[in-house]
Amino acid sequence: MDKLDANVSSEEGFGSVEKVVLLTFLSTVILMAILGNLLVMVAVCWDRQLRKIKTNYFIVSLAFADLLVSVLVMPFGAIELVQDIWIYGEVFCLVRTSLDVLLTTASIFHLCCISLDRYYAICCQPLVYRNKMTPLRIALMLGGCWVIPTFISFLPIMQGWNNIGIIDLIEKRKFNQNSNSTYCVFMVNKPYAITCSVVAFYIPFLLMVLAYYRIYVTAKEHAHQIQMLQRAGASSESRPQSADQHSTHRMRTETKAAKTLCIIMGCFCLCWAPFFVTNIVDPFIDYTVPGQVWTAFLWLGYINSGLNPFLYAFLNKSFRRAFLIILCCDDERYRRPSILGQTVPCSTTTINGSTHVLRDAVECGGQWESQCHPPATSPLVAAQPSDT
């Protein structure tokens, strides 16, 4: 999402030392975002087992959106910020701004879809997940992640709907008389600010909060069920030791999953909430938010594109192993039988009258999906959702 006022530098501009430090920082952010998202895409394309997992379609599409942000949006913003001038012309300014809004919104939409996918997988019965997340529905969700943002990016920006009523102010801020420089200024009127913020952030944010809250509640209820089973079987000497170990592992898994949810939502809010709160407030206070504040909030949102590979892929054991194999040139030390397709034990529990299968893969941090089969004695073996 582009800044509303591109005139972000002070009147004196940056000194030589400040420029070097700033350029180093911005280059590091861009490079990490490019490499991280590329690695995620290569891992899924390279490993057949990862391609079988439904959630990974969203992960790859998210990585592609974030990769485009880091290639098509961030570098031009960094150049303008460091050089304190826009040198690419007015038409490309509109194109870059439209790409900025399109790609960052698409990235946020993908995060929302991942949360909904995990909600159906963890909080609903297996057959519900299979019926909800069909290949057609996944394709429609992915298409929506890319098509819907065009209605708040290229369409209104190219038509100039965002600057109706504030054209004079925009023209004034495009030119810096002190440095004789021009800027790529993107400012929005009140209707566009509200519409864009609600569609691009507040609705996805609300859906993510609701989905992850339900996942958290389900995980806690599942852990409570296991704890009750432990207490009930504590007095029985016939209780197998392996069952105790498995229950303990499950509780640790659920605790880790809950912590991961907090990390995911915390990073998302930290990165994007400041920008979108300011995005709505600024038009109502006569555009008095300092340019430096806009720059800080904007790049905080960009950093989210570099964090997503770590949150949604690097925390997953299967992805990590694939990364090691790719980076170490297919080193045999990182291979093992059924390397990324091992069967993950699951436990079942009854919550609110419904039997659920909560995968051990919840510990994998936000992505959670895995090839997973309940114990052979479980009545849900036949109902287990397929990842193919």
UniProtKB/Swiss-Prot annotation:
Question: Outcome of altering residue 105 to A?
Answer: Abolished G-protein coupled receptor activity
Please, which domain of life does this record's source organism belong to? Eukaryota
Location of this chain's protein in the cell:
Cell membrane; Endosome membrane
Q: Which UniProt keywords apply?
A: Cell membrane, Disulfide bond, Endosome, G-protein coupled receptor, Glycoprotein, Membrane, Receptor, Transducer, Transmembrane, Transmembrane helix
Keyword set includes Metal-binding: no
The record lists the effect of residue 193 to F/V as:
Decreased G-protein coupled receptor activity
The record describes the protein's role as: G-protein coupled receptor for 5-hydroxytryptamine (serotonin), a biogenic hormone that functions as a neurotransmitter, a hormone and a mitogen. Ligand binding causes a conformation change that triggers signaling via guanine nucleotide-binding proteins (G proteins) and modulates the activity of downstream effectors. HTR4 is coupled to G(s) G alpha proteins and mediates activation of adenylate cyclase activity.
Q: Share the domain note from the entry.
A: Specificity for G(s) G alpha proteins is determined by the length of transmembrane regions 5 and 6 (TM5 and TM6).
User: What is the official name of this protein in its record?
Assistant: 5-hydroxytryptamine receptor 4
Q: Which organism is it from?
A: Homo sapiens (Human)
Q: Which gene encodes it?
A: HTR4
